[in-house]
């Protein structure tokens, strides 16, 4: 089966045909920034038209929460006016093929899980530490999406009850402490302001302030991992994202995990899929759902 996969992010929309895990005819456009609702309708219509007659189903990975085909977000700023956007209905105007939708981090999780031996690893988590902190959870070999599409929003678990207010409105979320956005919120106030990329450059040069800031992030992720392991019996975790894959970051996380009793720890690895994890994961997931549900029931 040939899939038209879409990956909708805050700044870009990627599209490609996915067949047998291989990407073909990939293209990328900017996410609309003005007249965003109408702009998104038009962008989706154009992408569907570009691939007309070349696919058997549509799989969409999107930032935010997918619930009954509607796109929303815990942090409305991430969608820039697309809150409560009828994503599935918008796509359905342009195709009669089956459509499946899920969160982009959930999709990336499913892609990463395809690389695991499911007989040995039945409980798996993917964590992305990037502009925000997100993830996905596989339990008993099944990706958890939840009844409202919010399963895996692990960046909005508690890290510090006295911490900064998160974009979701709660105080002290992991995302408000560990993310690239949280790092920049601090580093932009320094006497010599810098972005997260430069923070890590200074960290690797043993700059005291940069090191403290990166360590704060890594500690929050280490504690998140410990919470996930002890609450869900997670066997392996993959870490990705621009912060998560930054040189020296994963070793810091592992260092802090060593301070915990061993029952709180599991095997940690770097994520293997890059920018196309959402496309591939969404294509795999929707195909598996279609195969498991012959009547054509599609989640999202």
UniProtKB/Swiss-Prot annotation:
> One MF term from GO for this chain?
N-acylmannosamine kinase activity
Q: What is its EC number?
A: 2.7.1.60
Q: Which reaction does it catalyse?
A: an N-acyl-D-mannosamine + ATP = an N-acyl-D-mannosamine 6-phosphate + ADP + H(+)
PANTHER family in UniProt: N-ACETYLMANNOSAMINE KINASE (PTHR18964:SF169), ROK (REPRESSOR, ORF, KINASE) FAMILY (PTHR18964)
Provide the residue positions that the database annotates as binding Zn(2+): 156, 166, 168, 173
How this chain assembles, per its entry, is: Homodimer.
Name the UniProt record assigns to this protein: N-acetylmannosamine kinase
């Amino acid at each position: 089966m040939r899939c038209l996969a879409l990956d909708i992010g805050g700044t870009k929309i990627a599209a490609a045909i996915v067949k047998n895990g291989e990407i073909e005819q990939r293209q990328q456009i900017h996410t609309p920034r003005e007249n965003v609702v109408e702009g998104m309708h038009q962008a989706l219509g154009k992408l569907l038209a570009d691939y007309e007659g070349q696919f058997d189903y549509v799989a969409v990975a999107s930032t935010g929460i997918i619930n009954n085909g509607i796109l929303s977000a815990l942090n409305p700023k991430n969608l820039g006016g697309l809150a409560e956007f009828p994503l599935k209905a918008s796509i359905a105007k342009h195709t009669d093929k089956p459509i499946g939708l899920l969160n982009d981090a959930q999709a990336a999780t499913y892609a990463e899980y395809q690389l695991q031996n499911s007989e040995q690893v039945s409980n798996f988590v993917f964590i992305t530490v990037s502009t925000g902190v997100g993830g996905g959870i596989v339990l008993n070999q099944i990706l958890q999406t939840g009844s409202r599409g919010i399963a895996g929003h692990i960046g909005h678990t508690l890290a510090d009850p006295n911490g900064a207010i998160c974009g979701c409105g709660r105080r002290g979320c992991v995302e408000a402490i560990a993310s690239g956005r949280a790092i920049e919120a601090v580093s932009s106030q320094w006497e010599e302001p810098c972005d997260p990329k430069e923070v890590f450059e200074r960290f690797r040069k043993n700059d005291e302030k940069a090191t403290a800031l990166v360590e704060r992030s890594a500690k929050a992720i280490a504690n998140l991992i410990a919470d996930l392991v002890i609450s869900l019996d997670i066997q392996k975790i993959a870490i990705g994202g621009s912060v998560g894959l930054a040189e020296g970051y994963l070793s810091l996380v592992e260092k802090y995990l060593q301070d915990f009793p061993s029952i709180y720890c599991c095997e940690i690895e770097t994520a293997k899929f890059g920018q196309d994890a959402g496309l591939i994961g969404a294509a795999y997931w929707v195909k598996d759902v279609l195969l498991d549900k012959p009547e054509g029931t599609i989640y999202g």
